[in-house]
C-alpha cells in the first residue's frame, strides 16, 4: 500500500516535470506526497531509474 502511494506520487512527478527526482524526499518537499511512509524493517525505498518505479530493497 505504501509502495503504491509512492509510485502514484512518482508518476505525478514524472508527468509534471518529465524527469525522475534525485531523491524521494523531493516528492514531499514539492508536495507530491504529504510524507514519506515508514519503511518495513530491514528494507528501504529506492528509485529504480531504469523502470521509473519505486521499489523496496534490502538495507
Model-derived features: where do they sit?
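Extracellular/periplasmic head regions of type IV pilus-like filament subunits
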Residues: 1-4, 8-59
